[in-house]
């Protein structure tokens, strides 16, 4: 059983056969060819694989989101349905939001491809900090599953992120999706944008609409009522598609 590793903290948050499998993977992902490569790739525009946590790929056979207790299920279940559907439909990796309670402690990896969600006050002992604890497969370096510990402060305060209720909710959704992204194998894609020699908070690429990746540290993503909580198409989603392709490409 692999051991969990602590992800970075977030603030208020065979050649022919292999080739055929790769082509099938790209087709099932439902994205443009430019979203993936013909060799394993671990970073691209607006995304980066979480190789520091031993994750190099995303297994195609699906993941299940479960909950540490009934409170976590009641409070957080709805925040996972959107990104779960997006990964299922656009990446081709089934992600199911269940009603299951799993009491595996956060210090241990859950069973294969389970993602356990916790709703807890200051999981790191610091105001406004949530955390992902991704696990990886020792056999092939794919995302195994893990634990997501969401800081309850985001919900106990109605204006934690913003006094604007719509914006506040978009931030909540993005915070949840950000942590899910870590479990699925995405790291922070920040880079030294201003070339001052330091990679800083919010230093991330922007798309034509001005949005940064949802995986940007300490926060990013769409901030609208309709798109909040989604992986940004040309950044995060492209990265997840590549991680899925990597699963096959690493077997060649």
Identify the role of each PLM range.
Residues 153-176:
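Short pre-active-site segment immediately N-terminal to the catalytic Zn-binding motif
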Residues 1-35:
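Secretory targeting and sorting signals
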Residues 89-108, 188-196, 251-252:
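Surface-exposed patches in mature extracellular/periplasmic domains of secreted proteins
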Residues 170, 177, 182-234:
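The catalytic-center signature of Zn2+-dependent metalloproteases
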Residues 2, 29-75:
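Disordered inhibitory propeptide/activation segment of secreted metzincin zinc metalloprotease zymogens
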Residues 65-105:
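A short alpha-helix/helix-coil micro-patch that ends at or immediately precedes a cysteine
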Residues 95-129:
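Short, well-ordered secondary-structure micro-motifs within conserved domains or adaptor modules
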Residues 116-149, 201-202:
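Catalytic zinc-binding patch centered on the HExxH motif and its immediate surroundings
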């Amino acid at each position: 059983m692999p051991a969990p590793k602590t992800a970075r903290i977030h603030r208020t948050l065979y050649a022919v056969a292999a080739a055929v499998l790769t082509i099938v993977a790209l087709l099932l992902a439902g994205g443009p060819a430019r979203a993936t490569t013909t060799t394993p790739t671990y970073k691209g525009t607006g995304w980066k694989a979480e190789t520091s946590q031993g994750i190099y790929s995303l297994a195609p056979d699906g993941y299940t989101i479960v909950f540490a207790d009934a409170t976590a299920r009641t409070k957080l279940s709805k925040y996972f349905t959107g990104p779960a559907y997006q990964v299922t439909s656009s990446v081709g990796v089934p992600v199911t939001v269940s009603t299951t309670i799993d009491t595996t402690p956060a210090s241990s990896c859950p069973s294969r491809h389970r993602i356990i969600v916790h709703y807890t006050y200051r999981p790191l002992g610091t105001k406004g900090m949530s955390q992902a604890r991704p696990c990886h497969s020792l056999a092939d370096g794919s995302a195994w599953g893990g634990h997501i510990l969401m800081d309850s402060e985001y919900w106990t305060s109605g204006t934690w992120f913003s006094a604007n209720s719509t914006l506040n909710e978009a931030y909540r959704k993005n915070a949840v999706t950000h942590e899910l992204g870590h479990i699925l194998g995405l790291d922070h894609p920040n880079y030294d944008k201003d070339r001052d020699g330091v990679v800083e908070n919010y230093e991330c690429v922007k798309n034509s609409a001005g949005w940064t990746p949802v995986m940007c540290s300490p926060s990013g993503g769409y901030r609208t009522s309709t798109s909040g909580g989604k992986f940004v198409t040309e950044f995060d989603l492209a990265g997840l598609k590549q991680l899925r392709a990597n699963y096959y490409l690493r077997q060649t």
